[in-house]
């Protein structure tokens, strides 16, 4: 036991010595000091995007990007049209020949070779004269380039109209789809009045949409343009109700029902008055009745016409219907949060707009079914789809989604439309044969005194207009003939009698335009001492192969 006596006590009975507070290593133990207070690290936070980052106001950068995309779309459209190649189609040759005849009549008093106003589906003093002026300076390529310029302007107007109605993105999508349609591609390289008529309808529509916030009287600016469109192509009147409907709907949300109704009344009365005055002051009413209102019905079936309509315009129409349904369901077209606070048109208004634009695309097929003819259907489908295109643009933007969530779907849709447009346009532009060899063969046999029969008399009358007149050429679509004994013949019998008498100095048949009458003429020529076969010129077209058969009258 030591002096303290504690060493000899058992462990449980030991009394611990008091610990000194300043000795951290007492009894050979290390004591960890308490940790110092450390400030917590800041967590990662995403700052809120200021609304200024979603600015919807116009900007120079946005405008230039949009214009660049639109320019690219129009460049693609131009290339697709310019790549088409063939000699003049009979309609092109007819309008250009008529235009040259009208110019000679106006400037020199030369009698018209035919009464063009009686059977043209547009005024012969409007587009044919303009196209003939261009043709006289630049040839057929120049006349076709005029159509291309008009169709490019139409695409630009469609972009502007859609941007005004909906949004920038929808406008670019609408222009992109419209630019690659068969109708657009072909009409852009077609020297007929269709491109000019559609352009004028587009201008009238743009004026109506652009003046929606101006006083009602401003809509009268569209009146002369709309009337001129009808004068260029009488069937353009089919789309005047759509323009009137847009005059009502575009002004209603901003200027109220009274101003909107006044706009419609002003536009309807002024347009109707000008049309009535024009019909009364000119001799065009007979042409309107023969080619439009009282047109002879064909024999094409309803199912066939529906199939053709679906093939040539179904994809864009379905896209427009999808856009209309989505627009009715949700009107917002901008991703900016600011758009939620903007006043949007009501659902009833959106339903009416969707029905108006999409329903217009059905007018041409319905009218052609009524007439039971596929003639010009592909062009008229393009007229209707021009008005449905803004809704198709909305459909594409909804398909892609906000912030370009599904761009592959939009690319797939546009690529499909592009492939269809190219294939259909190539097929369309190859339907008629190349007439180069035929014109070269008959040129030495044609003069200003002879009388000629042709499946497509407009083509040689156009290419050989320096040597012959349109009045010298007889078509295979109806004929009257007085034989040498004074007997009168009409229809098929007229062809037989005229060939039997050797009335024609030259006969040119292609077997395509009217095969039934071609066979009648060929049978009448067979064994006829008045004629000998000058040549059988083979050709190839979209339907296969064929040949020009050319007979020339013998000397006796």
Residue positions per predicted region:
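Extracytosolic helix-loop segments that constitute the early lumenal/periplasmic catalytic or substrate-binding loops
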Residues: 77, 94-129
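Start-transfer (signal-anchor) and selected internal transmembrane alpha helices
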Residues: 1-79, 266-267
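Transmembrane-lumen/periplasm boundary regions of multi-pass, lipid-linked membrane glycan transferases
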Residues: 228, 240-243, 247-338, 346-349, ...
């Amino acid at each position: 036991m030591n002096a303290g006596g504690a060493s000899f006590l058992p462990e449980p009975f030991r009394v611990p010595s008091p610990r000194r507070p300043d000795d951290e290593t007492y009894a050979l133990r290390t004591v960890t000091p308490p940790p110092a207070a450390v400030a917590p690290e800041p967590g990662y936070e995403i700052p809120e995007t200021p609304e200024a980052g979603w600015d919807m106001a116009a900007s120079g950068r946005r405008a230039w990007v949009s214009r660049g995309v639109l320019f690219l779309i129009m460049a693609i459209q131009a290339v697709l049209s310019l790549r088409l190649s063939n000699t003049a189609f009979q309609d092109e040759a007819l309008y250009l020949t008529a235009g040259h005849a009208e110019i000679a009549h106006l400037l020199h008093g030369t009698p018209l070779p035919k009464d063009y106003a009686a059977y043209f589906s547009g005024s012969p003093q409007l587009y044919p004269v303009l196209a003939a002026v261009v043709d006289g300076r630049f040839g057929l390529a120049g006349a076709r380039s005029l159509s291309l310029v008009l169709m490019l302007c139409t695409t630009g107007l469609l972009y502007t109209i859609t941007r005004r109605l909906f949004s920038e993105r929808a406008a670019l999508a609408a222009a992109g789809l419209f630019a690659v349609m068969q109708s657009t591609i072909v009409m852009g390289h077609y020297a007929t009045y269709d491109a000019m008529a559609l352009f004028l309808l587009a201008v009238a529509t743009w004026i109506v949409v652009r003046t929606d916030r101006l006083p009602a009287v401003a809509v009268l600016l569209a009146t002369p343009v709309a009337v001129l469109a009808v004068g260029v192509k009488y069937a353009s009147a089919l789309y005047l109700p759509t323009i009137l409907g847009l005059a009502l709907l575009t002004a209603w949300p901003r200027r109220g029902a009274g101003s909107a109704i006044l706009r419609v009344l002003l536009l309807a009365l002024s347009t109707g008055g000008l049309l009535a005055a024009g019909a009364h002051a000119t001799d065009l009413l007979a042409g309107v009745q023969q080619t439009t209102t009282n047109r002879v019905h064909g024999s094409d079936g309803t199912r066939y016409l529906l199939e053709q309509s679906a093939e040539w315009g179904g994809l864009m129409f379905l896209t427009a219907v999808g856009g209309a349904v989505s627009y009715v369901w949700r009107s917002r077209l901008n991703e900016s949060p600011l758009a939620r606070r903007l006043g949007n048109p009501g659902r009833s208004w959106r339903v009416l707009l969707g029905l108006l634009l999409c329903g217009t695309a059905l007018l041409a097929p319905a009218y052609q079914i009524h007439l039971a003819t596929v003639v010009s259907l592909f062009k008229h489908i393009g007229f209707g789809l021009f008005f449905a295109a803004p809704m198709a643009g909305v459909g594409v933007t909804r398909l892609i989604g906000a912030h370009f969530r599904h761009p592959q779907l939009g690319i797939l849709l546009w690529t499909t439309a592009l492939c269809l447009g190219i294939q259909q346009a190539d097929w369309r532009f190859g339907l008629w044969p190349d007439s180069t060899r035929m014109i070269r063969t008959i040129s030495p046999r044609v003069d200003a005194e002879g009388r000629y029969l042709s499946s497509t008399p407009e083509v040689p009358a156009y290419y050989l207009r320096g040597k012959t007149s349109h009045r010298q050429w007889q078509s295979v679509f109806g004929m009257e003939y007085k034989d040498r004994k004074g007997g009168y013949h009409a229809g098929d019998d007229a062809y037989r009698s005229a060939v039997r008498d050797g009335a024609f100095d030259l006969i040119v048949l292609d077997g395509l335009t009217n095969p039934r009458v071609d066979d009648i003429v060929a049978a009448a020529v067979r064994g006829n001492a008045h004629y000998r076969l000058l040549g059988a010129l083979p050709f190839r077209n979209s339907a296969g192969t064929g040949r020009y058969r050319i007979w020339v009258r013998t000397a006796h």
